[in-house]
């Protein structure tokens, strides 16, 4: 990973629905440089107004982030954002990639393997707590993946 400390990590966040918007907002409020992407830009505007950077594609988010977090709707959305020539795996630079979408174990294993081939670390980190937990920064996060990446 390209980071020297957690406080200077450039974070990318993809997926600004009910949960993602609050989660990204907490990262921004904590002082992290934040690059954002969402299918509908208007969901990002409040965070952009507070200093986050809008990116036109997931690839742009990945290219400028040390850590990329995805919180999208469905496993098929995860595949679209992570895989392919415009995905985050192909465009990140030695990054930590974290998927917080509720998905399948098989997809998590596949993404971790693809990320490793691309020179990245990947963690599967679905959350529990709903929109209230996200708003109040009280989500429970169940993390799976390489212990070294988690540290």
What positions do the PLM features span?
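Short, glycine/charged-enriched secondary-structure capping and boundary segments
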Residues: 26-29, 49-51, 82-86, 111-115, ...
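Rossmann-fold NAD(P) dinucleotide-binding segment
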Residues: 58-70, 74-121
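Rossmann-fold dinucleotide-binding core
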Residues: 11, 102-151
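General structural feature for long, well-ordered alpha-helical segments within catalytic domains
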Residues: 15, 19, 23, 43, ...
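NAD(P)+-binding Rossmann beta1-loop-alpha1 motif at the extreme N-terminus of oxidoreductases
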Residues: 1-70, 95-96, 100-101, 131-134
């Amino acid at each position: 990973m390209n980071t020297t400390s957690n406080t200077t990590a450039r974070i990318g966040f993809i997926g600004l629905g009910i949960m993602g918007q609050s989660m990204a907002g907490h990262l921004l409020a904590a002082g992290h440089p934040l690059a954002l992407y969402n299918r509908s830009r208007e969901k990002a505007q409040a965070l952009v107004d507070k200093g986050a950077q809008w990116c036109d594609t997931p690839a742009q988010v990945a290219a400028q982030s040390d850590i990329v977090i995805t919180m999208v709707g469905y496993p098929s959305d995860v595949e679209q954002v992570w895989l392919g020539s415009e995905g985050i795996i192909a465009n990140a630079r030695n990054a930590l990639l974290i998927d917080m979408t509720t998905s399948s174990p098989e997809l998590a294993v596949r993404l971790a393997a693809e990320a490793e081939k691309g020179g990245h670390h990947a963690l599967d980190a679905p959350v529990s707590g709903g929109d209230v937990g996200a708003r109040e920064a009280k989500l429970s996060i169940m993390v799976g993946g390489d212990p070294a990446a988690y540290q």
